[in-house]
Amino acid sequence: MLSTGILCHASNDCGTESPGAAESFAGYNVRYLGEKVRQRLRAYGCESRIVSVRVLRELESAIESRHQDGDLDERFYRERLSIFRFRPPDDLPEAKSLIVIAVPQPLVRATFVWNGRARRYIVPPTYGASVNTNAEDLLTRTLEPDGYRVAPSALPLKLLAVRTGLAAYGKNNICYVQGMGSFHRLMAFYSDLPSDEYSCGDPTMLERCRKCSACIKACRTHAIDPDRFLLHAERCLTFLNEDTASFPDWVDPSWHHCLIGCMHCQTICPENKGPVHWVEAGPTFSEEETGMLLDDLPLWQLPDDLAGKLKTLGLHESLDVLPRNLRALIDLRGSSPSARV
């Protein structure tokens, strides 16, 4: 932190600090803390932006204008977008900034034993939510000694990341971060740390996407439309297998390849040429444990070891869809679609 000698140098008398010097010190201290936050996050491989909460108005306006123009499927809007809250939380009403973070995450390959066979299925990046707690703890440890706090947010993270320059959209409407591709998890925290940064530009697409159509060809559900910027999210396999409704009849069972989510448009993407090989081994579920999952048992009825494995994958809150998705992969009637990535 700044020494008293530097502080005194900016004032007429070391015993009396001028108003201008006090303001200068406060501004320097805020900038110093912001840079300290960014450096600490970068030490863990993360990238971040700190922007003024004024960006909230732009985010809300962007979502609502799309909705009013009829660009968003009504069911998708109701289930996925109406949950956002474009104002600081009650426990931090004086929030002045948003700390937007991209944390690198790998593919995780989990093993399920069923009918005597070990079957391996992928969980894509973004589902490992435990890193949110780790990031919040790091921010708290960094800012709390100087009297600043943080609080979680409920915001459209992809739009926020792109508008603040942290990421860029791919043609598949997935976010890409420099050095990570789409292998990351986004998060944002409110803070009462002041910020004058207000870079809220229009959504940008990766330059190489303009001459590439790999994801369009790879998308089984035709959710990626070459004639419009927005994804037909209501057709996206990720939306369908994260939703509790039955799969539509037009979904070919062979399209399923992840326990949740989809990687078809990401594994083929040139931006992921490096990250696509980042696969980590996940937990192994015994035949008994796999059977419990297929039996639709709620989390509270599962043994602690089994619940812990689900938490490791970030799927402990997805038990309303996981049994159905697992059945689609295993296919209890005989065939077993592969989940090779």
Tell where the protein language model's regions lie, with residue ranges.
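Iron-sulfur cluster-binding cysteine motifs and their immediate structural context
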Residues: A214-T238, S254-S286
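Auxiliary alpha/beta "docking" domains used to position bulky ligands
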Residues: M1-A10, G15, S24-R208
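Short Fe-S-cluster ligation motifs
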Residues: L240, T244-I260, M292-L315
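Cys/His-clustered metal-coordination modules, chiefly Zn-binding fingers
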Residues: Y190, D196-F247
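Conserved hydrophobic register position within alpha-solenoid helical repeats
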Residues: L322-R327
